[in-house]
Amino acid sequence: MKAVITVVTTLLVAVAATNEVHRSYDNDHQHQRSSSINGRQAATIDPAEATSDFWRQKAQETLKAKLQEAPVIAKAKNVIYFIGDGMSAQTIAATRMYLGNENKMLSFEQFPYLATAKTYCVNRQVADSACTATAYLSGVKTNYGMINVGPHVPRYSCTYNRTESEFLGLLKWAQEADMATAVVTNARITHATPAGAYASITNRDWEDDSYVTNAGCDATKYPDVAHQLVHGEVGKRLNVILGGGRRHFVPSTQMDDENVAGSRADGRNLINEWKEAHPNNATYVWNKSGLQSIDVTNIENVLGLFDSSHSLYNLEIDDQRLGAVKPKLTDMVDAALKMLTKDKDKGYFLFVEGAKIDMAHHDSRPRLALEETAEFSRAIELARNITALDDTLIVVSSDHGHTMTYNGYPKRGSDILGIGGYSDEDGLPYTTLSYANGEGYYLTYKEGNPAERVDFSQYDLTDHQTLYMATVPLNAESHGGEDVAVFASGPMAHIFRGNMEQNVLPDLISYAAKIGKYKENGGDGDGQPGSGSSLALCIQLMVVCGVTVLLGQLKW
C-alpha cells in the first residue's frame, strides 16, 4: 500500500500543473459568467450553428474539457447546500431560454458532477417539501407532510414518543463538528424546507402554537416550528437565520416591525426571546438596510425576518420599487457568507432555499418561476465565485418537480413565454409552457363549455401575473413526481454521480465533510479504520493520472 501511495503521489506532482486551472474556483470553463445573467435579453443565435463543423468543434471542446477535469479529493472544510424548491428539469431548461438562448448554462449547470435523485415519500408517489426535506437533510424518507419524524408515526400525531421517533441531520452533525451554521430562504423560515434543517414535527403546517392547539395537541409537549427554531437543539445554535415568517414569532395581540399582527396564541414574542438567548454580539434585522449594515467583525449571531409571511417575488420587489427595503435571495446569501467566512480557521455549513420557484408554479405563473430560478442561479454563482474550489463543497438540487412542460415545436429564437404552435384540431394557439393542472384551466377553456378552448393569444403573456394554460382544474397546481437533478462542485463532488434515492444525499455530504457518522473514523462509515477508503482513494488517483497521460497523447 505504501508503494502504491508513493507512486500515485509522484504522478500527481507531475500532473499538478495541468490541473491547476480546474482547481481554481473562478476559472472560465467551470464557472464562466454569462452576460445575460442579470436579466432577460433577446435570443442570440450564432450563425455558425448552420455549419456541421460548429457542432463537431463544440463536441471536441467539451470532450477536452472533461478529460482535463480532476476530482478534488480532500475533506470539505465548508459546505453550501442549495435547494431550488420545485426546480424541475423543465424549469431549468426554460430558464436558459428566458435568459437568452437554449445553449446558455445556468451557473450550477457548469458544475462538473451530476446525479439524479428519486423524490417519493414513504406513503406518496408524488412528494411534498416536508418529506423531501427530511430525506435530503436527515437521510430518512418519511410520510407526506412530516418533518424529521419516523414514518412509523402517522401525520398529525401528538401522542408518540419524541425521543424514539424524532431526529435531525446535517445541520446538527455540522454543529457537533464545531462548524458555523446558517439557514437562508425567501420563504417563511418556518416553512417545510428550512424547517427540515432544525425541526421535528408531524405536521408541516404547525408553524406556530396556534396551529398545534387548534389541532387538539399540547404545544408545550409538541412545540411548534418557530419555537424549535429559537429554543431547539439545532435552532438555538444557528449563527445566521435569514428569511420571512415574522408572524409566527409574534403574538396575535402585537404588531410586527411593519405593523402587521402576529399569529401566536401563547402571548410569547419569540423574537425577543431569541434576543434574550443571545445577549452578546447578536443582532436582529428586518429590512435590507439592516442586513447590509451588520457589523460582521463583532456580530456572531444574526436573526433576519424580512416579511410577515413569504418574501415577495423578485419581479414584485422590482415592480413595487422595494429594492431598498426587501433583500433578494442573492443579498441574503451574500450577507450569510460574510458572516460565515470571517473566521478563516473555522468551517461552516450554509443551507439555502430558493423557495419562490415552487410558489410561482403553484400559481401557474411561469414567468415568476423562471425569474426566481434565474435569481437562484445568481446566488449560486456568487457563492462559487467567492469560495475556494479546493475546500468548499457546493451541492445544488431540488426537492421535487412540477407539472409545467416545455412543449410544442417553437422556432429557435422564439420567446419562451410565448406561443409554441397552433393546434391542427381546433386551429387555436397553445403556449410553449403549460401545466397539467392548476388555476390556468379557467383561462384555457370557455366558461360553461370545457370542450372549447380560449384563444390564448389574447392574453399578455409577458405579464408575470398571467396564468398559463392548464388541462385539469385545481385551485393550486400540483407537484410532479419526476427525479430531480443534483449538481456538485468542490471537494469530493465526484461521488455525486448516477441515480439514487434522495435520502442518500446527506450521507454523501457528511462523508465529504467528515461529519456525523463519518466524523470519528476513517470515513468508511463502518466504525473501522479507513483502509478501504484509502485503497479507493489510491485507485481514483491512479485513474486521474492515467486520464491525464492519455490527454497529453491526444492530438487536438
Regions found by a protein language model. Give the residues of each.
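Cleavable N-terminal signal peptides of Sec/SRP-targeted secreted and luminal proteins
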Residues: 2-18, 539-552
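A post-motif C-terminal structural segment
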Residues: 33, 43-60, 72-77, 87-92, ...
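Short hydrophobic alpha-helical runs that function as membrane-insertion/retention elements
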Residues: 181-184
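His/Cys-centered metal/cofactor-coordination and adjacent catalytic loops
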Residues: 148-164
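N-terminal secretory/membrane-targeting segments
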Residues: 8-9, 13-74
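C-terminal GPI-anchoring signal of eukaryotic secretory precursors
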Residues: 520-542
